[in-house]
Amino acid sequence: MAKFIYPTDTTRVTSGFRGSRPDHHGIDLAESGYHPIYAAASGRVSRSYISSSYGECIMIVHTIDGVTWETVYAHMRSGSRTVKEGDYVTQGQTIGVMGNTGDSSGQHLHFELHKGSWNINKSNAVNPLDYLGKGDGGGTTEPSDKPLQPKGLGIATSKYPEGWGINLYS
């Protein structure tokens, strides 16, 4: 079983890892309404801040089986962050609410997973869909042969030219 859980209650992927946007180093999970954001695994908050691009953002460092991972949760609802730098969080703990802050064109969670520490070049980014599952069952952090599949992939539409912004699928 995967060591990382889905960071929100929707698995609707509106923009995948890289794909048509090679500089998109995470996945976008989106759905209208109120959606809490959860820590994908237990760890220590490395950053909890407001970024011009990520908006309301939290980064968490995890050490799993001696390996360092870092998760990024971006575009959270204004004022919804419930943790600060240095806090220890447990897997599934609510850390905020899905929103539309920063460089964003609609409510969604931009979620990144890095094998190693996050860096500005995002050279450690891996596709989160290869590692997400239903929880910590003492298994592995290696990609699953059959990762939990997202719902909602369809035809992409975007208000931005050349694929900029999040893609909304119908």
Outline where the language-model segments fall:
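Preference for bulky hydrophobic residues occupying beta-strand positions
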Residues: 15, 27-29, 60, 74, ...
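Cell-wall glycan-active module
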Residues: 144-170
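Generic beta-structure capping elements
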Residues: 16, 32, 63, 74-76, ...
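Conserved, short, structured surface segments that act as functional micro-motifs
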Residues: 56-62, 69, 87-139
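A short, sequence-level motif marking secondary-structure junctions
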Residues: 44, 74-81, 129-135
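Intrinsically disordered, low-complexity
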Residues: 1-12, 121-151
